[in-house]
Regions:
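Nucleic-acid endonuclease domains
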Residues: 1-461
Length: 461
């Protein structure tokens, strides 16, 4: 169905969009869509109809078809630091497993529909009625050259998985900025894929929430984000290849040698590893999470220290568990799922060539780096099993048993499934949180088993 109003230029559309800034969403709700509970697309539809005088559609081409302009309405939140972050990813068009692999990037459905976006940000406030959400900013979004090279690589990663018959194993952590998010009435919405008989979840191209947060801060707060790489570098090499190039001169060198080369004092301060890595990357003094490639792609870094056997001395720890959230959230909204589905890790791997017994003053050397995200098959099996088992134990009531000077519990431990488990991480036994059943327990974290970490990084020679 065509639009009721004809627009002759992108500037005319932008003028209309900007006229809504400072007004509330409800001022444009001419069809009372916001009174309909569960209408998730409601606010976008409200602005299509009430602001732009357009009929709601779900066509394959861009919304303003004659202008090649796609309208996207998305929520931002105000943080405690008084800046903004995206409330969620920006969902674009559905991935067609049967067709999309046939096209080049320039001819793809993704690029034809989304190369020019009109993005309208509204401010989400908890406990505020939808109709009272204020419209904050309207902006024309064209992918800047550096981002576009990474997005091309991301698109190709998704397409390559389809071609390999691996559409069922696509994960949002596979890519940097452009993700393939699940899309449907629920995560069980499935589709056929052309190169495998295994059904795959329906997915859509989307810009990650981390990418949208960085974009919102740039256009609203005018935050400038330093970048590691330039367009020319990204046209010929992947992000991983470029990272490997930066670390290559230091492979095989001891920590103290590297620190001397990059002029960083060796300390036992917790920030030492981060300072060392930022110096190696050529951005000394810059927090890694503030770099464009890290913030937009939600890349977190972890240092791993391997014993001479190739296995870390310790398991790898993550965040403290919110047990109340664990009980109440659905799997795909859970703390555990969100951490591993949406995050990519830069593992910086060091190795000792002596045991601690052989040399108390031993020093590790840099073995290598890798970008890693948890495979979808592990997320949906071992990780989900940890979530389900823990949820059941919490619902039944955790068994706390005095043992010597401490207290043991029946939460899944290191022998649970060889991949992930729960264990304490607290200052001492008095550092406790309340369980859903009212009992108190020493603060717990979720961990990845050290043997699993060893298996991940064993390809580094």
């Amino acid at each position: 169905m065509s639009t009721d109003k004809i627009y002759n230029s992108i500037e005319e559309v932008l003028d209309i969009a900007e006229s809504a800034e400072g007004k509330t969403v409800g001022e444009f709700d001419i069809n009372n869509r916001l009174d309909s509970r569960g209408n998730k697309g409601g606010i976008g539809q409200v602005l299509e109809e009430g602001l732009f005088k357009m009929a709601v559609n779900s066509r394959a081409e861009a919304d303003f078809v004659d202008l090649g302009l796609e309208l996207k309405v998305t929520a931002i939140k105000e943080n405690k630091k008084n800046d903004f972050s995206a409330k969620e990813r920006l969902v674009l068009n559905i991935i067609n497993y049967e067709e999309d692999y046939k096209d080049s990037f320039e001819e793809s459905s993704f690029w034809q529909k989304n190369k020019n976006l009109l993005i309208i940000f509204y401010l989400y406030k908890d406990k505020l009625d939808k109709k009272d959400f204020p419209i904050i900013k309207s902006v024309l979004h064209n992918f800047d050259p550096v981002d576009l090279e990474i997005i091309k690589q991301d698109w190709q990663t998704i397409i390559d998985k389809i071609k390999a018959g691996e559409a069922h194993n696509i994960s949002e952590g596979d890519t940097m900025y452009l993700a393939a998010c699940t899309k449907g009435a629920n995560a069980k919405s499935i589709r056929k894929q052309p190169f495998s008989n295994i059904p795959a979840k329906q997915r859509a191209f989307s810009l990650k929430s981390s990418y949208m947060s960085a974009f919102a801060r740039r256009v609203i707060d005018r935050q400038l984000i330093p970048s590691l790489f330039n367009v020319d570098e990204l046209k010929s090499k992947t992000t991983l290849q470029l990272l490997q190039e930066r670390f290559a001169p230091y492979i095989g060198k001891r920590v103290s040698e590297i620190a001397k080369l990059v002029d960083i004092p060796v300390t036992k301060n917790k920030a030492f590893n981060a300072n060392l890595i930022s110096a190696v990357l050529g951005v000394k003094g810059t927090k890694l999470e503030s770099l464009r490639e890290f913030s937009k792609a939600n890349i977190k870094f972890k240092t791993i220290r391997l014993e001479p056997t190739g296995i870390p001395k310790e398991h790898m720890s993550f965040e403290q568990i919110d047990f109340h959230r664990w009980v109440n959230d659905a799997w795909e909204d859970s703390q555990l799922y969100e951490k591993f589905e949406y995050t990519k890790y830069l593992f910086v791997v060091f190795q000792y060539d002596e045991t601690e017994k052989e040399n108390k003053n031993r020093e590790p050397y840099l073995k290598g780096i890798m970008l890693w995200n948890m495979p979808e098959v592990v997320i949906e099996h071992e990780l989900k099993a940890l979530w389900k088992t823990t949820k059941s134990i919490l619902e039944e009531g955790v068994q706390l048993t005095p043992v010597g000077n401490g207290v043991s519990n029946n939460l899944p431990g290191a022998s649970f499934n060889g991949i992930c488990h729960i264990r304490p991480k607290a200052r001492d036994g008095k550092d406790q949180v309340e369980l859903p059943d009212g009992q108190r327990i020493t603060k717990q974290c979720y961990w990845l088993n050290r043997e699993y970490i060893a298996d991940i990084v064993k390809k580094l020679k």
